[in-house]
Amino acid sequence: MRSSAASDVYKRQVIGMKKLRSEGKLDDLDVSEEINACSIVVPVEIDGKTEEWLVMFKNETHNHPTEIEPFGGAATCLGGAIRDPLSGRSYVYQAMRVTGSADPRVPIEATLPGKLPQRKITVGAAAGYSSYGNQIGLATGHVQEYYHDKFVAKRMEIGAVIGAAPRDTVRRERPSAGDLIVLLGGRTGRDGCGGATGSSKEHTVDSLLSCGAEVQKGNPPTAVSYTHLTLP
């Protein structure tokens, strides 16, 4: 569930998009019933010929998971961002990471009760994100970490990606009774159960001890094989 403030922002974005479309200002928007990633239509010149391609953008925030399990939280932040344009049948080829931390130089003794030290979060998150990106073969062209005292309350961990695919290779059909469903995913264990709701429930100073297992452990060596299914 979203917080009230976040929900209001989301509603305003949807209303804004509808207004822009009604004014004819989003002619390049790829409209579909799928909810995977922001998708636009762009002309691409290949060997002297112009083709229509779909370019897809997606970002993922893993503030809470990274706060309690830095390595896994940041790793699956990138993995989750890759998942959606991949579901849209596009090949993800570039990433961006924007994060926020309190001062990582603060002595461990000054760590707030129920929190990990800022240095532990910052270093662990950087290692987790880069580990996933290196193993799945995705270049991150922009990395920016902001430092502010307010981030001591909650870490900011944002991963964003961009993917693309020839428009004529993306088939969109409605499912019907009797269709065969194939599930693809990286190998994982029991970790991650409850992770989707973890950021919305009330936490205490003891949450750090019990919620680490809710953060999914990604498996990029397995996942990389099905990213190749979308290669143009």
What are these regions (language model features)?
Residues 1-6, 10, 228-232:
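Single conserved hydrophobic/aromatic residue that forms the stacking wall/gate
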Residues 36-43, 51-229:
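Mobile "lid/hinge" segments at catalytic clefts and subdomain interfaces of large enzymes
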